[in-house]
């Protein structure tokens, strides 16, 4: 019975530790950064005649994008306002 209690406590500890890391700012920024670039590329597809992804030449900061939570319409205005 004592061994079972220790195993249960250990399992609960592992679950708590794994979920703590899932919600840290660094973890959220990492996930956001990966999806932000794909989302911006989908909203403002690059054109062959342009060197960058954005027609205005101003690529939005990924840090700002993730911390401010820009909407799709804001990204279109900042990045591809002529589309």
UniProtKB/Swiss-Prot annotation:
Q: Does the keyword Disulfide bond apply?
A: yes
Swiss-Prot/TrEMBL keywords? Disulfide bond, Secreted, Signal
Gene Ontology CC terms, in alphabetical order: extracellular region
Disulfide linkage: 32-66, 44-79, 54-80
Instruction: State the signal peptide span.
Output: 1-21
Q: Where is this gene product found?
A: Secreted
Superkingdom of this entry's organism?
Answer: Eukaryota
The protein depicted here goes by the name Probable insulin-like peptide alpha-type 2
What organism does this protein naturally occur in? Answer: Caenorhabditis elegans
Encoding gene (name)? ins-22
């Amino acid at each position: 019975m004592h061994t079972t209690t220790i195993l249960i406590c250990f399992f609960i500890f592992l679950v708590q530790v794994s979920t703590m890391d899932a919600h840290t700012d660094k973890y959220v920024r990492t996930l956001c950064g990966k999806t932000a670039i794909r989302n911006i590329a989908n909203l403002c597809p690059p054109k062959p005649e342009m060197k960058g992804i954005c027609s205005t030449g101003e690529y939005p900061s990924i840090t700002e994008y993730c911390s401010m939570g820009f909407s799709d319409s804001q990204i279109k205005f900042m990045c591809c306002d002529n589309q």
